Amino acid sequence: LRFICQGFTVMPKHNYLLLSVLMLFVWVSADAFAKQSKPNILVVWGDDIGRSNISHFTHGLMGYKTPNIDRIAQEGMTFTDYYGEQSCTAGRSSFITGQSVFRTGLSKVGLPGAKEGMHEKDPTIAGLLKNHGYATGQFGKNHLGDQDKMLPTNHGFDEFLGNLYHLNAEEEPENEDYPKNKEFHEKYGPRGVIHSTANGKIEDTGPLTKKRMETIDDDTSDAAIKFIEKQAKEGKPWFVWWSGTRMHFRTHVKKELRGISGQDEYSDGMVEHDRHIGKFLDKLDELGIADNTLVFYSTDNGPHMNTWPDAAMTPFRGEKNTNWEGGWRVPAMVRWPGKIKSGSWSNEIMHHMDWLPTFLAAAGESDVKEKLLTGHKAIDRNYKVHLDGYNFLPYLTGKDEHGPRKEIFYFSDDGDLTALRYQDWKLIFMEQRAEATFQAWREPFIPLRIPLLENLRRDPYERALITSNTYDDWFLDRAYLLVPAQAYVATFLKTFKDYPPRQKAASFSLDKVMDMLTSNAGSR
């Protein structure tokens, strides 16, 4: 440009127009490059998948390989101490909002007809990225609310195609004892697969039947890829969250794929899920945008092992909906060529909540957490919330040696604080003693008068409480940790004074009904 401007004064007048056109081209190209320089963000999830089911962790121990998921890890960073939540809705809400489930009230598995769901006062990754010119699409399982106002397209996404519940709820209408009257189904039955857009269009494409479950991930991944192709053609940065229905139970694999794992139908579904991940990676390569796309793979929560053999596996104690690590630690890996070191492993503590501030930082807004404390506008809404996530971008890109997160607060689906992890230490305040079968969902968490103490570096699988003859002596010698832990929890709870919980967690028992009756009686 300097050369062009220097020559401008000696140019003949008839070349002024040519120069103007050239400078306009340079300006437009620079503007397009600036938009392109913002990374695309692709989030691909499974459902209820365990660490053992991914061959990157177990080298084929389960009898099959997952080469495409493994590729993300091999070309990026794998986490050993990564946390989801204890169940589906909790894991998804904490990811997309960057807030604790105790703050949003979205800790209980969402059921058809439930009133709880995404609230308009809570920002999302998608909505905040709109400020940076991103196209946003969500495809696959949502599980963040049953009503239209809770759909992703009312919370920052341009397009959504997917289902709203867990798979076993979707197939309930096919049960022989399911009520046949239309009124029951309209009030309590699952909605179909929804296709909606931000302009208010909502289409119910029909029920997610057992037969349709065989191909629903084909349909939603195809739609996601079509969305990506469109944005790539227009040179627009995009954020896509694809969340497959695999491997939530019950697994229904199409006939032509049965046997591809050499194991059982569940394993066939896992291999198929890996192929879906491969579709996305291949498309990024084909479009030539892989180097400018951050790819994150994970799942919502730990395995639902009480449905075995239609279930995932984990080396950690416990399973979904417990206070044990098996319900919380999930496989996680992230790839960003040239930014995140390939083949690296991280022992830092990280949680789903951390991606909101991290993705916003990658888009150029590293102070979104501070802005939201006082009020920040996005998608024509003014949000004022306390983010519980941390910005991991400096750590992921090698600028910082350690990640910013030191703690994990374990909330049950009822919204009770069951445990705290601080660095290597874990204190358990409420214990789920029914560790096996469906009783883990039915039986209550038991409050402890004195918490249990664990060191998750020396005993990551939480075996000492079961096997050690000298555990209590070891505990007593470290009782000095109890009071500081209480103080740490108190500091966290103080944040709720100015940023109180949005809603109370849903309940599967009569507790909420009784609360409503008591509230109504008191208002007379």
Which ranges hold each PLM region?
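Compositionally biased, low-complexity intrinsically disordered regions
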Residues: C5, V21-M23
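Formylglycine-dependent sulfatase
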Residues: P12-V21, A30-P447, P451, P460-R524
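Short, Lys/Arg-enriched N-terminal segments with co-localized hydrophobic residues
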Residues: L1-V10
